[in-house]
From Swiss-Prot:
It comes from Thermotoga maritima (strain ATCC 43589 / DSM 3109 / JCM 10099 / NBRC 100826 / MSB8). CDD domains: KaiC_arch (cd19486). This is UPF0273 protein TM_0370. Keywords: ATP-binding, Nucleotide-binding. PROSITE patterns: KAIC. GO terms for molecular function: ATP binding.
Amino acid sequence: MIKRVKTGIPGMDEILHGGIPERNIVLISGGPGTGKTIFSQQFIWNGLQMGEPGIYVALEEHPVQVKKNMEVFGWNVDPFEKEGKFAIVDAFTGGIGEYAEKEKYVVRDIDDVRELAEVLKRAVRETQAKRVVIDSVTTLYITKPAMARSIIFQLKRILSGLGCTSLFVSQVSVTEKGFGGPGVEHGVDGIIRLDLDEIDGELKRSLIVWKMRGTSHSMRRHPFEITDKGIVIYPSEGGEGR
């Protein structure tokens, strides 16, 4: 029997026929405003509720802002951080400013994947993390797209080796058909694509599981909403593509 990690996101585990296979690295891919970050934070929060420690690697936002954004949905990670069950790896401030001086896990040069890897390893070992989010992995290779696949592989080797189930947030432009970076889709175990489409003058959210190693899954596109408690997916309302 394959061990699975429950996302805890309403509707998602049904679509994945029980959850994400343990140790999988899953790309959460989509354009701006599609809900990628909320999806990832909800995954971490639900893990904490199930007793699974988590790490959030912040590459695009100040760690203080990450926590504020989570609190909007009632996800207060401070108690878990104090208990050593949750940590934010600060790969945003570059070690500048008073916040960074207090921060335990800081990556000073995001162009140095080895430094990120070392900080990440230490954070995972010290918190005994089972879930990891990197938001966004695109930031690591935006200036050197040819390195995208190699960077994904390096991080995958480390995180899978440490027993973590991980979500890598990947940005794509609104019109882009791919998943954000050349070859990244081959370096991950799963891809969940989030979309925001204009239909009859109204924006509609939907997602589709493009691939997921180790499990069967729904092949349909499913509508979802962002509520005051986070993302809710409607697994029985699969539309037939766009």
